[in-house]
UniProtKB/Swiss-Prot annotation:
This is Glutamyl-tRNA(Gln) amidotransferase subunit B, mitochondrial. The keyword Transport does not apply. It is an enzyme of class 6 (ligase). It catalyses: L-glutamyl-tRNA(Gln) + L-glutamine + ATP + H2O = L-glutaminyl-tRNA(Gln) + L-glutamate + ADP + phosphate + H(+). This protein may be expected to contain an N-terminal transit peptide but none has been predicted. It comes from Naegleria gruberi (Amoeba). It is found in: Mitochondrion. The keyword Transcription does not apply. Keywords: ATP-binding, Ligase, Mitochondrion, Nucleotide-binding, Protein biosynthesis. Belongs to the GatB/GatE family. GatB subfamily. InterPro entries: Asn/Gln-tRNA_amidoTrfase_suB/E, Asn/Gln-tRNA_Trfase_suB/E_cat, Asn/Gln_amidotransferase, Asn/Gln_tRNA_amidoTrase-B-like, GatB, GatB_Yqey_C_2, Gln-tRNA_amidoTrfase_suB_CS, Gln_synth/guanido_kin_cat_dom. GO terms for cellular component: glutamyl-tRNA(Gln) amidotransferase complex; mitochondrion.
Length: 514
């Protein structure tokens, strides 16, 4: 998963930390992908509907109405728990969390405070080290509990309007341990989880539509003084609705905490919100005003009891998981680098596109997996992203990409000409193969040794000083001479043959090949 390139993370910067270290935990609310709500038959659609059309009497809390559990939501939560390696609790229960808000008509939220459906999972993130390598880190997940969403309040200058379309929508609250130590790690975790949920089909992960929301808990401790990592006072930032705002909110909090502590002040336990325009967090309430939710088991709902057979049946519906796919791509026989493997994984259909190219029987020789992956991840995806087109709608087919790689491997075209060819494929959408385009434009690579020899002779004759320097051991001029030969061939001479033949002719020494 890729980080926000436009945002410079500061929570790993020692000049900012001043001996302190951050401790971060996340609470992520993911709307379960289900056609109907958690305890009613209403549709879960709320973004494209008129207000208050997907509301049953129970959703609106009419007296005498009772909840009826949607079993499919339990199945989806179990699937999520298994995907993160969690323990599926065969016994769980629903509890009431009491608080008043206009868009919560029941006066309480139905959640799983005491006995959640899932406990003790983990999710791996891969942290870039700045040198092209990645360091894996496992973030523990304390619990996944199933609960209902609230409605939506719309405010203007004079009124607050209530839309209950979202009220009762099924949520998974995914709570991590405080294992994260930077805003970068938090961003990586959320994006990895977002992709995982989409991949297994349990949440669409659309933060901009509110189906994935994040609360962050941030504290710092004085590592240079040997303080315990959990000795700091945490503050919670609620309802961050953009993956790119998560590191911004965290870094602001880290700086705020450190500034207070270095000035001799104490951190107050607070609940805050993030103002994306200002790039800062704002106080919502302090510890003294934290409500007592008066949790107790919901008397209208039975315990949720599962069997081992039920859990096993859910397990069979889980596709290959992202980490397993990356492991496959970075191992024999593919041996891709981590970056290219992730590009293929995170672009829908990318792995299938890659493997279809490699396994097609039309190629005269085996294609290099690394070269195929690079042409998809760098060249094709670069064109697609610039035009905001997905891989599934690519005007360049897998056969055309394969034809480019085959032509490069056979030295029929150069890498430079191949980039021109894929641009023509992309723009003209003609379906032509690489060699056809190369022939039409005079871009076939020159591999005739006699022709290349004549080009080398001409450059040697035109640059006697440089050739003399080369013969006297000044190797730095050799690449200059190579470039002149390539230029003379209009970019079509085989670089490997130019290197070999030019060196033989310029130094009067035959090159040896293994």
């Amino acid at each position: 998963m890729h980080t926000n390139k436009k945002y410079l993370h500061t929570s790993g910067d020692e000049s900012v930390l001043k001996g302190y270290k951050p401790v971060i935990g996340l609470e992520i609310h993911a709307q379960i992908k289900s056609k109907s709500k958690l305890f009613s038959t209403s549709s879960t659609e709320f973004t494209n509907s008129m207000p208050n059309v997907n509301v049953t009497l129970f959703d609106a809390s009419f007296p005498g109405t009772l909840p009826s559990l949607n079993e499919y939501c339990i199945r989806q939560a179990v699937k999520t728990g298994l995907a993160v390696g969690g323990k599926i609790n065969l016994y769980s229960q629903f509890d009431r969390k009491h608080y008043f808000y206009p868009d919560l008509p029941l006066g309480y939220q139905i959640t799983q405070q005491f006995y959640p459906l899932v406990s003790e999972g983990k999710l791996r993130i891969d942290i870039p080290q700045g040198d092209g390598t990645y360091k894996p880190k496992y973030i523990r997940i304390a619990r996944i509990q199933v609960e209902q969403d609230s409605g939506k309040s719309v405010h203007d200058l004079d009124n607050t309007l209530i839309d209950l379309n979202r009220a009762g929508n099924p949520l998974m609250e995914i709570i991590t341990y405080p294992d994260l130590n930077s805003s970068l790690e938090a961003e990586l975790f959320v994006k990895k989880l977002q992709f995982m949920l989409r991949h297994i089909g349990t949440c669409d992960g659309n933060m901009e539509e509110g189906s994935l929301r994040c609360d962050v808990n941030v504290s710092v401790y004085n590592a240079s003084a040997g303080d315990h990592p959990l000795s700091g006072t945490r503050c919670e930032v609620k309802n961050i609705s953009s993956a790119n705002n998560i590191p911004r909110a965290i870094d602001f909090e880290i700086k705020r905490h450190i500034e207070l502590l270095t000035n001799g002040q104490k951190i107050e336990q607070q609940t805050r919100t993030f103002d994306a325009k200002k790039g800062e967090t704002l106080l919502l309430r302090s510890k003294e005003n934290i409500p007592d939710y008066k949790f107790f088991p919901d008397p209208d709902l039975p315990y949720v009891e599962l069997t081992e057979d039920y859990v096993e049946s859910v397990k069979t519906t889980i596709p290959s998981l992202p980490d397993d796919i990356v492991e496959k791509l970075t191992s024999e026989p593919y041996n891709l680098n981590f970056y290219d493997a992730n590009i293929l994984l995170t672009n829908n259909g990318g792995v299938e596109f890659f493997e279809t190219i490699l396994h097609d029987s039309r190629w005269s020789s085996k294609l290099n997996p690394k070269l195929v992956a690079n042409w998809i991840a760098s060249e094709l995806m670069g064109l697609l992203n610039a035009s905001e087109i997905t891989l599934s709608d690519s005007p360049v087919s897998y056969i055309q990409i394969g034809s480019i790689v085959e032509a490069i491997q056979h030295e029929d075209i150069s890498g430079k000409m191949a980039k021109k060819i894929i641009k023509i494929m992309f723009d003209e959408k003609s379906g032509e193969m690489a060699l056809d385009i190369a022939e039409k434009n005079g871009w076939r690579q020159i591999t005739d040794k006699n022709v290349i020899g004549e080009l080398c002779d001409k450059i040697i004759a035109e640059h006697p000083t440089e050739v003399g320097n080369l013969r006297n051991g000044k190797e730095n001029v050799f690449q200059f001479l190579v470039a002149q030969v390539i230029k003379l061939s209009k970019g079509n001479a085989s670089p490997s043959l130019v290197n070999q033949i030019l060196r033989e002719k310029a130094t009067n020494k035959p090159t040896t090949t293994d």
